Amino acid sequence: MADRPLTQQRLRKSFGKIAKIVDIPNLIEMQRISYQRFLQMDVPPEKRETIGLQAVFHSVFPIRDFSGTASLEFVSYRFGEIKYSVEDCVHRGMTYEVPIRITVRLVVFDVDKEKGIQNIRDIKEQEIYFGTIPLMTEQGTFVINGTERVVVSQLHRSSGVFFDHDKGKSHASGKVIYTARIIPVRGSWIDMEIDPKDVLYIRIDRRRKFPATLLFKAFGYSTEDLLNYFYQTEKLTLTPKTLFKEFDAKTLRGQRASITVKMPDSDEVIVKKGRLFTQRAVKTMAQAGIEKVAILQEDLEDKVLARRVLDPKTGEVLYPANHEIDEATLEAMRDAGVQKFEILYSAPGTGGDSVRKALLLDKVESREEALVEIYRRLRPSNPSTVEVAKDFIDQLFFRPSHYDLSAVGRMKLNMRLGLDTPVEVKTLRREDILLTAKTLVDLKDSQGAVDDIDHLGNRRVRAVGELLENQYRIGLVRMERAIKERMSLQEIDALMPNDLINPKPVSAVVKEFFGTSQLSQFMDQTNPLSEVTHKRRLSALGPGGLTRERAGFEVRDVHPSHYGRICPIETPEGPNIGLIVSLSTYARVNEFGFVETPYRVVTEGQATKEIKYLSAMEEKDLPIAQANAPLDEEGFFINPTVSSRVEGELTIVKKEDVKLMDISPNQLVSVSSSMIPFLENDDANRALMGSNMQRQAVPLLATEAPLIGTGLERVVARDSGVTLVAKRDGKVVAVDASRIVLQHEDERKDRMDKQVTIYNLSKFTRSNQNTCFNQRPIVKLGQEVKAGDIIADGPATENGELALGRNVTVAFLPWGGYNFEDSILVSERLVRDGVFTSVHIEEFEVVSRDTKLGKEEITRDIPNVGEEALKNLDDSGIVRLGAEVRPGDILVGKITPKGETQLSPEEKLLRAIFGEKAGDVKDTSLRVPPGVEGVVVDAKVFARRGVEKDDRTRLIEDEEIAALEKDRDDELKIMEDTVRSKLITIVLGQEATAPVKKGKAVLIPKGQPITAEMLEDCPLAPLEALVLKDEDHSERVHELLEIYREQRESVQMSFEEQVNRYQKGDDLPPGVIKMVKIYVAMKRRLSVGDKMAGRHGNKGVVSCILPQEDLPYFENGTPVDMVLNPLGVPSRMNVGQILEIHLGRAAKSLGDQIEALLEEQKLDGLRQKMQEIFSSDADEVAGLTEQELLEVAGQYKRGVHMATPVFDGAKEDEITDLLSSAGVSPSGQAVLYDGRTGERFKGEITVGTMYMLKLHHLVDDKIHARSIGPYSLVTQQPLGGKAQFGGQRLGEMEVWAMEAYGAAYALQEFLTVKSDDMVGRTRMYEKIVKGQNVLEPGMPESFNVLVKELQSLGLEMSLIEEAK
């Protein structure tokens, strides 16, 4: 708190015990950093890294033609000028984008086919316009076609290798089937599985499986190579009579002795026959120098040859590798004189025989056969040759153009398989595939564990930059095909690069991504918190992700690795639960896309100030202490053992073994959840509702920050982008409701930096959710501000803090059944004082087009409309600002030409005499839709270039230009004043060598010392002629004036550019002549049926608005504002609201005490009280002057603001102490009296101040009535829903109810004339007009539809009518 004066920033009494180690990082930096890395806009072309856009161009270029005679190479890209500002794009319905230009080089070769040499014949380099690319605004959003959108980051499975098993569910035998999968970012997937028969199979791209060894042989490995790679071997010696096994400590241990083994020099038995070779026995044998062990022939049954056996005499192959040994085999080998051979060592833990079985199945011997066989299986229709097949396999896995593991994939592969291949190698290598198979075989043999795919080490975040990079690549690949075709079709020498490149496919893909992708979403702009959380959202849905239907329970569940990375609370209720999540407060995404969280480094039991960001993989096996572990002043753990997390499990660890410590208790939860005070006392389900409902709170007209907050309110307000934040230190030189002007001091006296910043505030603009976006200055004239200070409040912020609702006095009490089922009883005072009044702005748009029948016209001259209806329109036919409008009122008058009708001779004559009549146009004016009643706050007119502007357009233009002129004049004036003050410091007391004149008047005489008065009145332009005796000073003067002149010209130029932009007309869609947008503001007061909620998931609907005098009141006569149902607390288990209400009572009562002291002007008592309340900041309070003390205390008249951080908040005894010091009952309850009877309620009642929000589900938007309206074309029944102006459906259950009551005539009326009996409807109308009350029902249209449908099925159906 000490960094800002108390008078400028509200102080909150904080109950947090844990010291703040590190500030919360900027809440929307993930979006910004990702997009900056993608564009590298501020990096010179030659210094750009191969990431993002640069990487995409490098991966597609160079593009070579089919014959190899020409190549199109990429050199660099650069960005053009931004044409329109963000605000202009929003108003004009345009996209905020920047043009991109690429420099490419076309190289033409002379190819000597015989020698295979290429010589460069020609090089042409050219810069080409390459379409536009949307830019991100400072707030991390995109403006697409005039609406703000957010690209949500996607959480998807990382590339790399994954091992898994099916838990025995796939096969009837219940055998566990193990699988491995190598997933690239781009290219073919490899799946390996060991099937129930224990054979290792491979699938490529989920096609038909084939034995894995087929692929290994295609890579050039022989059967022997594979057996020796996957298995250990044993060497045997064959003599005519006996068999010996070479002594090998590794393989021998654990085997049984088939013959008793004795010491070589004595009869001492080492291992008896039939016993196991133990470690001790093997060691004894090694010491005794035993080199071979005799075995029996039976021991070789079912054993397999590891290498082929050759005939020693002829060199022929007697038996191939992988041959099973039997008696005949041994006899044949003895006969041939074979003395040494090798067998495979098989024992538990040596890999099983799945590879050996696959080798028996693959039926190929050579590499060539294997290649052809795989090609035949994957491409059955194509003719197969060895060369084609080899090229195909190469292309599948080993070519960067077709296969990309990405740096992440390579890193994950290295980590999982224990490799150290450089990260730059982004294709697979043969060893990777082989090692994956070996790991899978070992896994089947119970060595190692399978991967957990829901672990955050195996899921990564694809932020905006990467999502757009993938789209851009798709566009470039489409363009590449077209370029190759053009290169081969036309004569290449005559072509320039721009003849080959057409950027349309790329632009189309980017446009499609931003416009229609599931991840590009309409920004939730209900309030600042909803904006921030929308930008921090992670979605598992979207292209390449999961679908709601397929996602199981595991993916949606909270995982231990989410701790500090993903919020376990904030997720939507409904089908998307767990698939859409939010980043935790301190979390960030690293360059590989993994979510990291910060920890304090702990060394030898001391928590240091060093901070380390770790991903879920990096914190594996590290004991992590919680943030609330008790520490002494030096940072050492107080207790000898510390409760820590290891791999998500809680364990007790010695303090010396702890490696890391959490940074803060709220690093666990998201921004929205950490705005809930006493979150630790709420049930998880209700906390979820609480964090979701805060995002639906409507910004109120009069904002008020919560008395009981969590200390995060300021951070959210600052980072959301709705408040104005000072970019540099400065002083406020001008401030009004629409702009703030800051003047900056220079660091050096004689230098000229930009002197002034003008902040234009947003006034009553419409947000995406139709809420009102309005900024108010919170600085005073002359105030000094620091960079990063909030200088203007936005919607739902107060004094730089988030303020979503209002503090109201709430009692928990049943009241006449009006708070049944969570209903809320509200005081009339809240409506009268506009406590929960909000402003909503609707936008209405009308366009006049050039139609086939002629031009539409926006005009006041509308046929068949009386003067009364036109009273609010100006001469141009557009409603005036400030007009109060109701449903049906005309906002913009518009007429459209009708089709030519055949005129009678009389009409022709009349038309010839009286000229054009209004008969050939129809009224298509924009009218106010039902349910909208308010005031016109803004109108915008956009006219096509070359169309004559009407008066209203000129008026709007003049206002805009006047505002620009004011900004320019202010900037120039401050610049001039600054220059003048700097000049005075340089030339004071100096003498001029020649007089400075303006016309004939002498401004500065020659030879006299220059005074401040001379310069005060002197214009700056003539001073350029000033020459001083001191040359050094003279030079500084001219340097200063030169900089001033340049800056002045730059300001003037920018002003002229903006004016020019306003005057030259607008870019409108084809066929549109003029577009008018009207904004109508509506005041929504709190009314019965509005949904309200607290911050703990305690939601309800307003059931009754009671007069103040009927509500329960305190002993001093103060009535409460709201009555809630006490039964809503116990079963919901959100006790946080009770603690909030108690602390709120204390805060309010302390505020009352401060107010009393202020009124009595008891300054000593006031200072003492303030020091008592803000005990942690007592020294600062003591240092305040009397005036400052009064100013600071004035902020707390309506209650003392407190902060109770999540998981580190106020304890029960602290609340009771505070209640006592505030002079109220420590129980937090009070005696209340019934306002209707004046009698006291039985028992004391829980009452206090609670923060309540009004949610976006307003009754005015939902209520709807219809008498007559549109009917469905086919069934002729009324449409449904408010948007269609529909009726209430009378369904079959309602028909049953009417039947049950026997109301036959009423029912007949419902089903015929009131619904779809067309003839009956007209007859009914006639009867009503004539005053007769006779019902004549006809045939309902829906019955006719049924008859026609049955007839269309070929069933002849007709209705037999009885004669009356």
UniProtKB/Swiss-Prot annotation:
Tagged with keyword Transferase: yes
Name the record gives this protein: DNA-directed RNA polymerase subunit beta
The subunit field of the Swiss-Prot or TrEMBL record says: The RNAP catalytic core consists of 2 alpha, 1 beta, 1 beta' and 1 omega subunit. When a sigma factor is associated with the core the holoenzyme is formed, which can initiate transcription.
Reaction catalysed? RNA(n) + a ribonucleoside 5'-triphosphate = RNA(n+1) + diphosphate
Give the Enzyme Commission number: 2.7.7.6
UniProt keyword Transferase present: yes
Gene name of the record = rpoB
Q: Which Gene3D superfamilies match?
A: 2.40.50.100, 2.40.50.150, 3.90.1100.10, DNA-directed RNA polymerase, beta subunit, external 1 domain, DNA-directed RNA polymerase, subunit 2, domain 6, RNA polymerase alpha subunit dimerisation domain, RNA polymerase Rpb2, domain 2
